[in-house]
């Protein structure tokens, strides 16, 4: 049922259940700001899972081989490598601090034994090589094993260095640093399907880079007006098409998505397609423009659809139909009546991400109170689940949660007034081939999988 591609009925139902697998991170009540997870990303095979945090660290988990001796063993994720990707900096020209927080991580397809990933903070993108060493050279002529020079008068024979086995060591080394190309904060990076180029987007510009060239990039989108007082929208997310290397999309704070073709011109100021849903005038309010701002855009694996996340909903668009989305899934419609208080505590500006499962049949996104939502596109069923340590026994099934908006509250329901808005799930990731999901809840990383009966 859950087969390759993470299909089945992942949004719930009698024949499909999600169960707890692992949780990573400290249990502390007082969470240090630096430990808060800011991005989560599986690699192309799903064997590696990377997280970045506000302290500039990247932690990579590797999936262990399945244990045939243990019943229901699916292969757990354990720490593979941890390294400091970015450090805090200071821009002396603008008197601005540059945070070390990792905004995005993107894996490159594996070409050899090593793994490569891109990580970015607000200003600088880095290409990292993750490689293993289990052998070391011994028997040098001029140096001892500890690196000291040998006495030339004691060298009586020529030695041929040999490789000796050693304990496995995982090294993370920065291979490229792409800097000084963004005036504003970088919100997106996306690797092209040609595996040679990638884009980076900030509030007003999108740049195209070659992975081998660090000292120059091409500006492919520039929406900065001559007079900044005329600025009406900013770029919120951007992504390359998974198969067509000339096509990319970017979303805006006005709730629109532009699809651009780099073959048409060097500067993609004119879009090839423009996706926008007409607004219902009767529902317009002070908050309409804020909640329509798109916080994430993701192409489906097939390249036929794209998904956008705004504050209250997830929309699925057919690339051949610009006028309206083919699907709209309400994530937490019960918050519409709370927009005023959410505006006052700044939660209305939270940027939720979204992701597809491997077969594009289901989508997942986060909410408040450590809830996350799943929508099955085939059955139209949806479910609300919770990432909580209270339900963290191995293979414990996740019980669907319900939020009630008023009137009598049933035993298993939670009132909208008692939701904890400090507990929010902004970042989630779905294994590219199996029903395994990773959910970041503050400083904890939860891993869930489909239950094998």
Curated annotation (Swiss-Prot):
Keywords: Cell cycle, Cell division, Cytoplasm, Mitosis, Phosphoprotein, Repeat, WD repeat. GO terms for molecular function: enzyme-substrate adaptor activity; protein phosphatase regulator activity. GO terms for biological process: cell division; exit from mitosis; mitotic cell cycle; regulation of chromosome segregation. The modification Phosphothreonine is found at residue 308. Disruption phenotype: Mice are viable and were born at the expected Mendelian ratio. Mitotic cells display increased chromosome scattering, associated with in the presence of enhanced phosphorylation and perichromosomal loading of Mki67. It is found in: Cytoplasm. Belongs to the phosphatase 2A regulatory subunit B family. This is Serine/threonine-protein phosphatase 2A 55 kDa regulatory subunit B delta isoform. It comes from Mus musculus. The gene is Ppp2r2d.
């Amino acid at each position: 049922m859950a087969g390759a591609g993470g299909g089945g009925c992942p949004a719930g139902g009698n024949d499909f259940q999600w169960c707890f697998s692992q949780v990573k991170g400290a249990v502390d009540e007082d969470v240090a700001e630096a430990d808060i997870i800011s991005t989560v990303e599986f690699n192309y095979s799903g064997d590696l899972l990377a997280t970045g945090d506000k302290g500039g660290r990247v932690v990579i988990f590797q999936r262990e081989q399945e244990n045939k001796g243990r019943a229901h063993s699916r292969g757990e994720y354990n720490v593979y490598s941890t390294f400091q990707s970015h450090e805090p900096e200071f821009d002396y020209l603008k008197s601005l601090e540059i945070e070390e927080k990792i905004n995005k991580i993107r894996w490159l397809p594996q070409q050899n034994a090593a793994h490569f990933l891109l990580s970015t903070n607000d200003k600088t993108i880095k290409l990292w090589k993750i490689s293993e060493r289990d052998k070391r050279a011994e028997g040098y002529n001029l140096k001892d094993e500890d690196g000291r020079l040998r006495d030339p008068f004691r060298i009586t024979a020529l030695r041929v260095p040999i490789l000796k086995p050693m304990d496995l060591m995982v090294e993370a080394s920065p291979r490229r640093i792409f800097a000084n190309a963004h005036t504003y904060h970088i919100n997106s990076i996306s690797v092209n399907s040609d595996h040679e180029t990638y884009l980076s987007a900030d509030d007003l510009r999108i740049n195209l880079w070659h992975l081998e060239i660090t000292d120059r990039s091409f500006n492919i989108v520039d929406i900065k007006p001559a007079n900044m007082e005329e600025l009406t929208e900013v770029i919120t997310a951007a992504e390359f098409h998974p198969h067509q290397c000339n096509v990319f999309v970017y979303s805006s704070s006005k709730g629109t998505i532009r699809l651009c073709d780099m073959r048409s011109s060097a500067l993609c100021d004119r879009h090839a397609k423009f996706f926008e849903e007409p607004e219902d005038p009767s529902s317009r309010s002070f908050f309409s423009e804020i909640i329509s701002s798109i916080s994430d855009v993701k192409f489906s694996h097939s390249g036929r659809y794209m998904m956008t996340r705004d504050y209250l909903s997830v929309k699925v668009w057919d690339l051949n139909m610009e006028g309206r989305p083919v699907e709209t899934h309400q994530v937490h419609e019960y918050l519409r009546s709370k927009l005023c208080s959410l505006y006052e505590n700044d939660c209305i500006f939270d940027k939720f991400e979204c992701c597809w499962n491997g077969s594009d049949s289901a989508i997942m996104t986060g909410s408040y109170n450590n809830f996350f939502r799943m929508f099955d596109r085939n059955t139209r069923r949806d479910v609300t689940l919770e990432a909580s340590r209270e339900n963290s026994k191995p293979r414990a099934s996740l019980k669907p949660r319900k939020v009630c908006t008023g009137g009598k509250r049933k035993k298993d329901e939670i009132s909208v007034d008692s939701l904890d808005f400090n507990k929010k799930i902004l970042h989630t990731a779905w294994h590219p081939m199996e029903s395994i999901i990773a959910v970041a809840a503050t400083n904890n990383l939860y891993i869930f999988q489909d239950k094998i009966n």
